[in-house]
Design a protein with these regions (language model features):
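Glycine-rich, Arg-bearing micro-motifs that act as flexible, cationic patches
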Residues: 15, 108-130, 148-152
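Short secondary-structure boundary segments
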Residues: 9, 42, 108, 112-114, ...
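A short acidic, glycine-rich active-site loop
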Residues: 56-65
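General small-molecule cofactor/ligand-binding pocket signal
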Residues: 39-41, 82-86, 140
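Charged helix-capping and loop-helix junction motifs
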Residues: 21-23, 98-99, 123-128
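Small/aliphatic-rich secondary-structure junction motif
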Residues: 2-57, 73, 77-79, 159, ...
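Short, flexible loop segments at boundaries between secondary-structure elements
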Residues: 134-150
């Protein structure tokens, strides 16, 4: 069995910390329980248009900064961790995350949900929703750290081959 946890993080300008912090804490706790290595992954989206390549997600190294901070915090907590940055075309973030999970033979993919709404699809967000439906390995979706107490448990999880 794999000894890796893939922690997928974003750096969305709207509020990059609450859901990322909650997911990182969950990955830290899982790693402490299992001794697994944590791979912190950020995927940049880009589009190619008439005038060349255009970055569509956060710029100015925000993604790299978030990854570096989380890796540093995990290591300070005694967890083995490394960071990775990948790029993909717009709309293919879930596929890129699953590709990295496959490459690293991750035991589980962990990510946070950034939405505040109660509508299930919007609650999870499009990337989280796609991961849950496409994954052939366990996926754990963690609510925002400021979510109501009723949502203190993971929002959704799969076991294997997309089972919930």
């Amino acid at each position: 069995m794999s000894k890796n946890i893939l922690l997928a993080v974003d750096a969305a300008p709207r509020d990059p910390t609450r859901h990322v912090v909650a997911a990182a804490a969950m990955a830290r706790d899982l790693s402490r329980d299992t001794g697994d290595h944590v791979i912190v992954l950020h995927v940049h989206e880009f589009a190619v248009g008439r005038f060349g390549r255009l970055q569509v997600d956060c710029g100015d190294g925000e993604g790299e900064g978030v990854v570096e901070t989380i890796v540093s915090d995990l290591r300070a907590a005694g967890v083995s961790a490394e960071g990775e940055i990948r790029e993909t075309h717009v709309g293919h973030v879930a596929t890129a995350i699953l590709s990295e999970a496959e490459e690293h033979d991750a035991r589980i993919v962990v990510l946070g949900s950034s939405s505040r709404t109660d509508l299930p699809r919007l609650l999870l967000g499009s990337v989280a929703s796609r991961l849950l439906h496409m994954a052939a390995r366990p996926v754990l979706i963690v609510p925002r750290s400021d979510a109501p107490a009723r949502a203190a448990q993971p929002l959704a999880a799969t076991t294997a081959a997309g089972e919930r």
